């Protein structure tokens, strides 16, 4: 198993700002660590072809299309094919492998999980700077998300390499998370006074900034919470909400994306460098294609989720509802821009540190036109 020494003390990224060291990793059961480690093939006998290299990969969330349609076939079918059988891979979703998403990056850093999908919103609970790409209402549509991702990627690549010893190999996104409500609403301002299901610190801060009442509820309980009136609105993905019956529990949903769910596929640097050069090249090329497919899927699934909840003829694979779709308008866009500048970004900078405002203004502000204020 590849071993990577834990970082000692603070590290300094390429741009010169001192940053916090990676947070300590909690103790993990020995059996789990061994099961997730890189499987190294035994050396072949003289004259025999080399034994295949066997990789163990921690993928994204189970049961979602990103994993079932894209990640699993890529690693189990395409990787052996594009490497001529030189590399074989096993993959399992992290949430079915006894791994907390909050610890995935640390496990990759230590080499316990050599290759894994890191959901940035979860990793940000230890290091808020990681999720500067997917703050609430930062990316109201996929075109904006693409610009933000392209702007933030060079910094995120350097951060992961220098702070964690991890290589960013691909960047993925889940479909947009939108707002479902039991009663009519015409925009963000109408959420004042309403109890809203949220799933992250950033979403809760946004709802508080709108004078709403954030309520953190597990996704599986969201439909019942809406039906029973525990909450009046919920933030979740349009198609996922449709799958659990939110089109029957709510009457209106927004087209405006609140969050997305950006993740990175990352490798322990030592484990990545240990692969033969030609295998690395072919896998990297394959991951670039996979990234493009996943982004395309996220865009299509976002639109399809809205179509199904609204009962449109274009609905595919979902249950048709009769929901009203709340379109964005000029007043709502102005409110979104103010909230981003006055609530969302300041809240993130408070958690992240004043240096994060400087980083944001260097990388992201030129792409979207919104600057972060330093504390």
Name what the model sees in each region:
Residues 47-143, 162-163, 167-375:
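N-terminal secretory/targeting leader peptides
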Residues 1-27:
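N-terminal secretory signal peptides that target proteins for export/translocation
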Residues 26, 30, 75-76, 156, ...:
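Hydrophobic alpha-helical context, especially transmembrane and signal-peptide helices
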Residues 41-47:
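A short, compositionally biased domain-edge/stem linker segment
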Residues 29, 65-66, 151, 155:
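Secondary-structure junction/capping motif
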Residues 140-157:
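A gly/proline- and charged-residue-enriched helix-loop-helix capping module
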Residues 29-41:
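Bacterial N-terminal signal peptides
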